[in-house]
């Protein structure tokens, strides 16, 4: 693997629930927001400079945040994919001194820890039993702390402790992964303008992939559209899919497939279902997220709980797939969002995308946007993730 030369880059105790096992990156939806790309660009405004070198930005919660002149120590709390996006944006993880244990498990199991081994040295101990300890976070002496915009209580506690805190939204764009990724890149461009060209390149590449998929799938009839079931979490006691208010809906809409769980109104990871519903939907294809240890073989062999998958079309035709794990778990928005889109489209409609070589696509994307040359083996690793990717997150097998 080759990549561009990297740039070298205390208070009262307050324990807050971060709810890592259920909702840190999928917290309650904000009232404002739109799915339009115009709005993703308007949310993040140009930073205004002050005479003393400080700059102000508007974060995703609408807060005016004054940034320090130098940002050398960063903590990312409960926006789980952000450490990977930030590392690739900066082409370094050296500034990251603290991240969530759930972000760390993905870094260890996926590609991020290999590309930026320094991220494996980031502290995770400021989370104790899925709760965030402000005193432990303060001990890391961060110049900047990112937090989930929906966790307003945490944001208030961070600022009250004298920390510079920036809110990052995961729901403002109605679970549109591409728009959310674009907005994250816009925000990073405001904070770190020296890399703003990378933000534009990522957004343009994502739009290009969306356009390619639309062109190839636009003539599909309703009968030709595949029925897709997302298995977000699966264990002896849980069977959770993506309803209409979660990332699975966007992935299906973007590739002109049908999310069989669209009828479920529950938001985030709360769309629990039973096997009778799965039988009635009879999906053509099943995608298993990396937020669960379940693998395709578990459905083929009925090795989890008492459920029998043998009559489900996707299982009978061996059309069950584990989602990729590149820089982060690909079910959510992240640095790999354009490649997740292309992989989903090619997997669901192989005949329409027979000219697409995913190894070439991923290598070109990483090189063009991030300046990183991936080997064939590294790309293959992304598409054969282990069960370790789910470590630390919620209920697992």
PLM segments and residue spans:
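Alpha-helical, coiled-coil/dimerization segments enriched in small aliphatic residues
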Residues: 242-268
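Short, low-complexity disordered leader/linker segments with a strong preference
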Residues: 1-70
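A contiguous binding-surface segment within folded domains or other stable secondary-structure elements
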Residues: 270-325
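Proline-aspartate-enriched helix->loop->beta-strand connector
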Residues: 124-129, 133-150, 274-291
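Short, solvent-exposed loop/turn elements at domain surfaces
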Residues: 65-67, 82-87, 105-109, 236-241, ...
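Structural recognition of the beta-strand scaffold that forms the well-ordered cores
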Residues: 73-77, 97-100, 144-148, 165-169, ...
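Extracytoplasmic substrate-binding proteins
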Residues: 54, 154-237, 262, 315-316, ...
